[in-house]
Swiss-Prot record:
It comes from the Bacteria. This is Large ribosomal subunit protein uL6. One of its GO terms (biological process) is cytoplasmic translation. It comes from Citrifermentans bemidjiense (strain ATCC BAA-1014 / DSM 16622 / JCM 12645 / Bem) (Geobacter bemidjiensis). InterPro entries: Ribosomal_uL6-like (IPR000702), Ribosomal_uL6-like_a/b-dom_sf (IPR036789), Ribosomal_uL6_a/b-dom (IPR020040), Ribosomal_uL6_bac-type (IPR019906), Ribosomal_uL6_CS (IPR002358). NCBIfam families: L6_bact (TIGR03654). SUPFAM superfamilies: Ribosomal protein L6.
Length: 179
């Protein structure tokens, strides 16, 4: 039995879960999410909780059991609280600003980097060097943060670049000159 898969998912107040096989829809105060559920698992929706069970003990069913439960839980959390990822920009002259649906980044290139934000994602900029990527879909929030970081990943010598707020960069010693 999957230790994660057998846990029930509590439904907070204001969140509605609708399951019409194979699609599950979750609606809440922050928005709506829908996802297709794979084969091998059964979903039982009550007023207070959602439980995920598997039909049999095949490898496919066992692997889908915990995954399905976690995906549904992320949907419920997303429409009730939302998700956010914090990014930091380090470097002289490196900065960010948001204009409408476009994130403008100055990252030391000869040109500014303009990144169009996906639908449902908002970015707040604090002090031009701290970014907060927010949204209701955990996958899209993480993917957007990873794409922003990929424009200029942190380098190991001075630490310049875009990094996650909780990320530690292994620093290297520079060259030592001959004497």
């Amino acid at each position: 039995m999957s230790r994660i898969g057998k846990l029930p998912i509590a439904i907070p107040a204001g969140v509605k879960v609708i399951y019409n096989a194979p699609e599950i829809k979750v609606e809440g105060p922050k928005g709506k999410l829908a996802r297709n559920i794979g084969e091998g698992v059964a979903i039982d929706v009550t007023a207070q909780a959602v439980t995920v069970t598997r039909h049999d003990d095949t490898i496919k069913s066992r692997s889908a059991h915990g995954l399905t439960r976690t995906l549904i839980n992320n949907m419920v959390i997303g429409v009730s609280k939302g998700f956010e990822t914090l990014l930091e920009i380090n470097g002289v002259g490196y900065r960010a600003e948001v204009k409408g649906n476009v994130l403008n980044l100055a990252l030391g290139f000869s040109h500014p980097v303009n990144f169009e934000l996906p639908t449902g994602i908002t970015v707040e900029v604090e002090k031009m060097t701290k970014l907060k990527v927010m949204g209701i879909d955990k996958e899209v929030v993480g993917e957007t943060a990873a794409k922003i970081r990929a424009f200029r990943p942190p380098e190991p010598y001075k630490g310049k670049g875009v990094k996650y707020a909780d990320e530690t960069i292994l620093r290297k010693a520079g060259k030592t000159g001959k004497k």
